[in-house]
Amino acid sequence: MNIDKALVLRTCANNMADHCGLIWPASGTVESKYWQSTRRHENGLVGLLWGAGTSAFLSVHADARWKVCEVAVADIIGLEEPGMVKFPRAEVVHVGDRISASHFISARQADPASTPTPTPTPMATPTPAAANIALPVVEQPSHEVFDVALVSAAAPSVNTLPVTTPQNLQTATYGSTLSGDNNSRLIAGYGSNETAGNHSDLIAGYGSTGTAGSDSSLVAGYGSTQTAGGDSALTAGYGSTQTAREGSNLTAGYGSTGTAGSDSSLIAGYGSTQTSGEDSSLTAGYGSTQTAQEGSNLTAGYGSTGTAGSDSSLIAGYGSTQTSGGDSSLTAGYGSTQTAQEGSNLTSGYGSTGTAGADSSLIAGYGSTQTSGSDSALTAGYGSTQTAQEGSNLTAGYGSTGTAGSDSSLIAGYGSTQTSGSDSSLTAGYGSTQTAQEGSNLTAGYGSTGTAGVDSSLIAGYGSTQTSGSDSALTAGYGSTQTAQEGSNLTAGYGSTGTAGADSSLIAGYGSTQTSGSESSLTAGYGSTQTAREGSTLTAGYGSTGTAGADSSLIAGYGSTQTSGSDSSLTAGYGSTQTAQQGSVLTSGYGSTQTAGAASNLTTGYGSTGTAGHESFIIAGYGSTQTAGHKSILTAGYGSTQTARDGSDLVAGYGSTGTAGSGSSLIAGYGSTQTASYKSMLTAGYGSTQTAREHSDLVAGYGSTSTAGSNSSLIAGYGSTQTAGFKSIMTAGYGSTQTAQERSDLVAGYGSTSTAGYSSSLIAGYGSTQTAGYGSTLTTGYGSTQTAQENSSLTTGYGSTSTAGYSSSLIAGYGSTQTAGYESTLTAGYGSTQTAQERSDLVTGYGSTSTAGYASSLIAGYGSTQTAGYESTLTAGYGSTQTAQENSSLTTGYGSTSTAGFASSLIAGYGSTQTAGYKSTLTAGYGSTQTAEYGSSLTAGYGSTATAGQDSSLIAGYGSTLTSGIRSFLTAGYGSTLIAGLRSVLIAGYGSSLTSGIRSTLTAGYGSNQIASYGSSLIAGHESIQVAGNKSMLIAGKGSSQTAGFRSTLIAGAGSVQLAGDRSRLIAGADSNQTAGDRSKLLAGNNSYLTAGDRSKLTGGHDCTLMAGDQSRLTAGKNSILTAGARSKLIGSEGSTLSAGEDSTLIFRLWDGKRYRQLVARTGENGVEADIPYYVNEDDDIVDKPDEDDDWIEVE
């Protein structure tokens, strides 16, 4: 070795990298790229001069690579640490382990020739080593002192390497205690204690304590305590405490505490505390605390706390707290708290709190709070709160609150609050509140409030409030309020209020109010009010008020008021008032007033007043007043007054007054007043008043009023009024009025009025009025009025008015008015008016008016007016007016007006007007007017006007006017006018006028006028006029006139006039006139006139006139006149005249009988004079035209 060289010792990782990342070579030169001549460690290479000095900068890892470098003495700078030097470059001369490197340096120190005597540099502080002199030792080192001499003394001589290996290696400073078994290596600072088994490697700073089993590796900073079983690896910073059983791997920062079972892996930042069972893996940031049983995997950010049972997996952000039982998986963002029993899976965003029982799954956004029992699944958006018992499933949007018992399912939108017992299912829109006991099912729209007892089902629209006891079912529209006790069923329209006792059923239209006791059933139309005690049944039309005691039954038409005690049955028409004590039965027509004692039965017509004691039976016509004692039976016609004691039977004609004791029989003539008891027989002349109970036989003369009980037989003369009970048979003369209960048979003369109960058969003469119950058959003469309930069959003469219930069949003569219920069949004569509910079939004569409900079929004569509901089929004669909802099919005669809804099909005769909804198909005769929404198909005759929405297809006859939306297809006959939106296709006959949007295709016959936006394609017949926007393509027949924007293409026949903008292409036949802008191309036949701007190309036949701007090219046949600007090229044949601006070329093509030859002249400097007309004379010379001939050109 050269005496100007010194040896330096240093260590690297097993990949030859130092702590700065520099990769050292196995041999050869290494140099610092950022060298600075300072006494600092950075910006240079450092090491121990001759391998002696502080060990603070030597690697303690067992796999470290020890390198010996040869450094020039002149490059060495001494550092403050004992033995440490800095140098800019070095040559690596040896790489091995600690022992081989020590041997290498010791051998070189023993060689006098290789020992340098370096001259100190100005900045160097250490004393240079002399030959064969030991390196100086620091008296009070702050770190362990490393000396290659000590290492070499403990190892065999270099000449015997590697024959023998040391049994153990121990290096320590004063005050340390080292104890190692075979093949152990122990290194410790002063005041340390190290104890190791076989094949162990312990390295610790001063004041540390290390205890390891066999085959272990312990590395710790000063003041640390490490205890490890066999096959363990512990690494800790200063002041740390690590305890591990066999096969564990612990890594911790300074001040940490780690305790691990066998085969565990712990990694923690400084100040952390980790405790784990066997087969566990813990990773934590600084200041964290982790505790896990065997087989667990914990990962947490700094400042976190994690506690896990066996076989669990915990992942958390910084500052989080996680606690789980065995077989659990927890994942949380920073600042979260999660607590779970065994087998649970929790995932939450930052700042969340999750608490779960065994086998549960929790997922939550940031800032959420979740608490669940075992076997539960909770999912929530950010800022939500969920609490559930075992076996529950909760899903909520952000900011929601959910509380559920066991085995429940909750789904809610954002900002909702849900609380349920076990086995419940709750679904709510955003901002809703739901509270349910166990076994309930709640569904609500947004902003709703639902409260349910056990085993209940609630469904509500948005903004509703529902409260129910157990075993209840509530259904409500939006904005409704429902309150029910257990076992109730409530259904209400929007804005309704329902309150029900236990086991009740409530049904109401919108805006209704219902209150019922237990076991009640209430049904009401919209805007009604019903109040009932337990066990009652109430049915009312819209706007009614019903109040019932227990076990009562109330039925009322719209606008009625009913009040009853318990066990009562009340039936009333619209606008009636009924008051009854317990056990009563009341029946009245519309506008009636009834008051009954207990157990009474009252039946009255409309506008009547009935007062009865208990267990009485009263029947009266409209406008009557009846007062009966106990168990009395009163029957009176309309407008009568009857007073009877109990058990009496009274029968009186109309306008009569009857008062009878019990069990009496009364018979009276017309205008009479009779009062009789039950089972009485009353006979009265006409104009009499009779009142009788059921099973009575009444006979009355003309103008009589008869009122009979059930199953009575009544016979009356002209102008009589009869009122009969159930299953009665009534016969009356002309102008009679008959009233009967259900299943009665009524026969009346002309001008009669008949009122019958259920399933009655009524026959009346001309001008009669009949009213029948359900399933009745009515027959009347001319001008009659019939009213029947559902399933009735009505037959009337001319000018009659018929009103029927559901599924009725009506037949009427001319000028009749018919009104029928659902699924009715109506037939009427000329000039009739028919009104039917949905799915009705109407047939009318000429000039009729028909109005039908949903899915009806209407047929009408000439001049009729028909109005139909949805999906109707209408057929009308000439001049009719039809109005239908969507999906209707309309057929009308000439001059009709049809208006149809969505997707309708309309067919009309000549001169008709049709208006249809979306996607309609319209067909009309000549001169018709059609209007349809987009997507429609219209077909019209000659001279028609059609207006359609976009995507429509229109076909019209001659002289028609069509207007359509975009993307339409229009076809028209001769002389038509078509207007369409952009992207339309128009086809028209001769002489038509077409106007379209951009990018349209127009096709027209001869002499047509077309106007289109730019980019359109136009095709027209001869002598047409076309006007198009820019970039259009125009094709026309001979004699046509075409006008287009720039960059357009125009094609026309002979005798045409073409005008186009710049960069256009014009093609025309002979005798045409073409005008275009700059950079255009023009082509025309003989005797044509062509004009274009600069840089254009013009080509014409014989006898043509061509004029163009600068830099143009003109070509023409014989006897033509060509004029162009500067820098142009002109080509003409025999007899042509050419004139051009400066720097142009004039070419004359001449035929000599065998071939063509050319005469060329150039204008400008060195050429002929510019802007002078030239021609070829008889001598084949190019000469200019004389001035006197300048005006020879004849321009058309």
Curated annotation (Swiss-Prot):
PROSITE patterns for the chain: ICE_NUCLEATION
Comp. bias regions, Polar residues: 271-298, 319-346
Cell compartment(s), UniProt: Cell outer membrane
Disulfide bonds: none
Domain commentary: Contains many imperfect repeats of a consensus octapeptide A-G-Y-G-S-T-L-T; further on a 16-residue and a regional 48-residue periodicity is superimposed.
Major place of residence: membrane
Name assigned to this protein: Ice nucleation protein
Membrane-crossing residue ranges in chain numbering: none
Membrane topology: Peripheral membrane protein
Keyword tRNA-binding part of the UniProt annotation: no
Gene coding for it: inaV
Similarity comment: family membership: Belongs to the bacterial ice nucleation protein family.
